[in-house]
Amino acid sequence: MTTPEWDIYVVDEVSEWIDALDDATHERVVQALDALAEGGPSLGRPLVDRIAHSTIANLKELRPGTVRILFVFDPWRSSILLVAGDKAGQWTSWYEEAIPLAEQRYETYLKERAQEEGDQ
């Protein structure tokens, strides 16, 4: 019996950021995304960790190397990649900018997705 994979939605800014990565980093990110699609919410450390100090209760980060991708599982059982970056050399300050941005993008995503779901 095969386990169904989780859908992953990617905001445009994250998609563009991933596309611009060097080959080695891109490959690490793709492997991490494959693991996320396969493991879903059961995926844990060291690849996934929970983010504190956010208004989103279940905000998490995907952690391939020094790359961080903030994501959340939405009410439709999908994951949405909200913010991505390489926090090398800025281990604390990166979150001060990334968390509010993730919260804003998630709010926008929820509104758009709810409209789409309502139209079906």
How does the language model describe each region?
Residues M1-T66, P75-S79, D86-Q120:
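Basic, Lys/Arg-enriched alpha-helical interface segments
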Residues F71, L81-L82:
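Conserved catalytic cores of phosphodiester-cleaving nucleases, focusing on short active-site segments
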